[in-house]
UniProtKB/Swiss-Prot annotation:
Keywords noted in UniProt: Cell membrane, Membrane, Methanogenesis, Methyltransferase, One-carbon metabolism, Transferase, Translocase, Transmembrane, Transmembrane helix
InterPro entries assigned to the protein according to its UniProt record, in alphabetical order: MeTrfase_F, MeTrfase_F_su
Protein name: Tetrahydromethanopterin S-methyltransferase subunit F
Entry keyword Transferase: yes
Record's catalysed reaction(s): 5-methyl-5,6,7,8-tetrahydromethanopterin + coenzyme M + 2 Na(+)(in) = 5,6,7,8-tetrahydromethanopterin + methyl-coenzyme M + 2 Na(+)(out)
Pathway(s) annotated for this protein in UniProt: One-carbon metabolism; methanogenesis from CO(2); methyl-coenzyme M from 5,10-methylene-5,6,7,8-tetrahydromethanopterin: step 2/2
Source organism of this protein record: Methanocaldococcus jannaschii (strain ATCC 43067 / DSM 2661 / JAL-1 / JCM 10045 / NBRC 100440)
Lineage: Archaea, Methanobacteriati, Methanobacteriota, Methanomada group, Methanococci
GO biological process: methanogenesis, from carbon dioxide; methylation; one-carbon metabolic process
Subcellular location: Cell membrane
Amino acid sequence: MGVEVSNKPNVSSIQSYVEDLEYKVGLITRNRGLESGTESAGTKGLIIGVVSAIVLMGIPLALYFLMK
């Protein structure tokens, strides 16, 4: 008797690989989402900082020129 050869795919191992792949893709997309949130918060903070600096520097300069 020889070794039996089967053309049937091993469905359980394929499902296991798919589940692992879905898990890893989920982690990658979660990390990307968290990173984009951090980047948008950093950009928002930068914009608020620039506007605040312009206002805080503009008020004394405006008063200085108005008092002349």
